[in-house]
Design a protein with these regions (language model features):
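C-terminal membrane-associated helical module and adjoining short loops/tails
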Residues: 1-44, 148-406
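N-terminal signal-anchor/initial transmembrane insertion module
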Residues: 10-77, 81, 91-93
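Alpha-helical transmembrane segments of multi-pass integral membrane proteins
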Residues: 23, 87-88, 116
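Juxtamembrane helix-capping/reentrant segments at transmembrane boundaries
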Residues: 39, 102, 106-119, 167-170
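Alpha-helical transmembrane segments and their helix-entry boundary regions
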Residues: 47-50, 109-113, 141, 176
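Membrane-embedded alpha-helical segments that form the functional core of polytopic membrane enzymes
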Residues: 54-111, 127-128, 139-151, 222
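Membrane-interfacial alpha-helical segments at the cytosolic side of multi-pass membrane proteins
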Residues: 59-64, 122-134, 181-188
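Alpha-helical transmembrane segments that form the membrane-embedded catalytic/substrate-binding core
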Residues: 98, 112-128, 172-179
Length: 406
């Protein structure tokens, strides 16, 4: 049984993407730059190849962080921060150019949107790991992933109901990424220790401000940065997402309860991982941040992918039970950690083994969804994806029309 039904197939044929980027920086600075960049790509290069190439930059960035700081609590060489910044800039550029290439080659389709947003969902995890390397924040890296994942999920949820993806005047894909790669480049000059030491040492001006309730507590600068990101970006964005969805639901005389139910799988994911980490006898968040973030990142990607597919196929609003498939595995490590609590800290199964299995499960589930949906949309729309021969040339990835005839 496939992921797309007969109604979904007909909807895909009529689907048209609607989006708006209200960022002033994007409009007057980056858009002209991206418009020039797209001319550097040959017309035969499919948009999805550009998307995939941009995503691999972040995978490489996370890999560098793992090689030089496996627990993300030691300072990597300075050039690694420079590489993090450059690779993130390239990712942002390629992510913006792929859509322009699709319009340039008249190859836009729902599959391109799904492929692009699917890579972006996974990118949250890989860039969080790169940022964790730069901030030297260890287990706190998971919280930085959360700062990216929450607005991303809520924006996808809002898009599901409003049918238009609106990026506000200041948004994550533009100004947010710019701040992050500037932080990487800044760390190339200062060193990662600047973020990991007490914020009053990094910013001496705060040493003059009387804070009696914090005078005996050492607070790393990255914790202050995390709080500022939550208060200044995440909370306002979430409030806007909920408000926009509520406005649309009320205008259609729908149920806000059904709308909010679609957030439950994401809440269940965060709750399950949080319970596992709090009970963990081996402190997995501190000792294995890469495996934890990657496993949860692919879990998150699966949830986002199912919601995007539901939007593309105009499925009924409400909870999607299939989304809980990605959460089933979390029952085992939680039970294993509970057993350790009553067994003098000795789990039945080594947590490193469970973490590896968790990653394998979520990666496998995500790839199954991705490959299946690619083939189903390809057949539904009569397009090729990832590889095709056009006029004697082999196209390695992307979306190209099927030639007429047999």
């Amino acid at each position: 049984m496939g992921f797309i039904g007969a109604h979904g197939v007909e909807t895909l044929k009529r689907y048209r993407y609607s989006g708006e980027d209200r960022s002033v920086v994007a409009k007057y600075v980056l858009q002209p730059f991206w418009s020039r960049c797209v001319t550097l790509f040959p017309l035969w290069m499919p948009p999805n190849m550009i998307t995939l190439t941009g995503f691999t930059f972040l995978v490489l960035s996370a890999l560098l962080g793992y090689i030089y700081s496996p627990r993300l609590d030691t300072a990597p060489p300075g050039w690694v921060h420079l590489a993090h910044g450059l690779l993130l800039f390239l990712y942002q550029t390629f992510d913006a150019v792929d859509g322009k290439q699709a319009r340039r080659t008249s190859s836009s389709s729902p599959l391109g949107e799904l492929f692009d947003h699917g890579c972006d969902a996974l990118a949250c995890a890989f860039e969080a790991l790169a940022l964790g390397s730069t901030l030297m924040c260890g287990g706190w890296t998971f919280c930085f992933w959360l700062v990216a994942a929450v607005p991303f999920y809520l924006a996808t949820w809002e898009h599901f109901f409003t049918n238009t993806l609106i990026l506000p005047t200041i948004n994550g894909p533009t100004e947010g990424l710019m701040l992050i790669y500037v932080s990487h480049l800044f760390t190339f000059l200062t060193g990662a220790e600047w973020w990991a030491q007490d914020f009053r040492k990094s910013l001496p001006i705060f040493g003059w401000i009387p804070l009696p309730f914090l005078s005996e507590i050492e607070i790393p600068l990255y914790v202050i940065v995390l709080i500022l990101m939550i208060v200044g970006a995440v909370i306002p964005t979430v409030r806007s997402n909920v408000s926009n969805v509520q406005e649309v639901v009320e205008a259609r005389n729908g149920s806000m309860a059904l709308a909010l139910a679609m957030i439950l799988p994401f809440i269940a994911l965060l709750a399950g991982v949080s319970i596992w980490c709090s009970l963990s006898p081996s402190s997995i968040m501190r000792n294995q941040p890469h495996l934890l973030v990657i496993g949860t990142g692919f879990n998150f990607g699966y949830l986002v992918g199912r919601m995007i597919l539901a939007h593309l196929c105009d499925e009924p609003k409400g909870l999607k039970s299939g989304m809980f498939m990605s959460l089933v595995f979390l029952c085992f490590p939680i039970a294993n950690a509970l057993i350790a609590k009553i067994n003098d800290g000795m789990p039945l199964v080594d947590e490193l083994v469970l973490l590896v299995l968790y990653c394998a499960y979520t990666v496998g589930l995500y790839l199954h969804l991705a490959v299946s949906v690619v083939h189903e949309i390809k057949d539904a729309l009569g397009i090729y994806c990832f590889r095709e021969t056009i006029f004697g040339f082999v196209v390695m990835a992307g979306i190209m029309p099927k030639p007429a005839g047999p």
